Amino acid sequence: WPLSILSVFVLIHLMEGMGKKESFIISFLYGVGYWLIGISWVYVSIHYHGNIDSLSSFLITLLFIFCLSIYMGLFGILYSYLSFESTKSTIIVFPICWGLIEILRGILFTGFPWLLAGTTISDTFLGGWLSVIGSQRNSIVLMIFCGALSPPIASTAIVINLSIIDFSIIL
């Protein structure tokens, strides 16, 4: 679960100051990685249980991943449309957009509510909320934490990078 949270920090950092097109591309590619890691079991189901050859199973799974990644791309467009250059935007708008896209993904076209971000933290201190508010709302809570912690982490990374550069110059 720590990698899922770290990946959200990276996504927030990459989307800062981007336009709608760039946000779509970044979020879409994030979605490809997200789904590629999370639903590799679909390939196994298609290939072994569906008795379909390896190449066809791979292509079907890849098409499925690209279709699901469109939701993340839509998230990027929605976030870039509603956000403004502020920490409040990251804390408020980012979680709302993420939650709306997860709800949409769970409803539209008979839904595919798998890999909800809220279920990744079921074994953490936030896991107790899972049974009370559900996975989708727990995702929003997780994204609020990610949005709130993102600026301090980004500024720390800048300080670390500058320190490395300074150290390199001194050497």
Model regions: which residues?
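Membrane-embedded alpha-helical bundles of multi-pass enzymes
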Residues: 1-152, 171
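Low-acidity, Ser/Thr- and Arg-rich intrinsically disordered low-complexity segments
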Residues: 150, 155-156, 161-163, 168
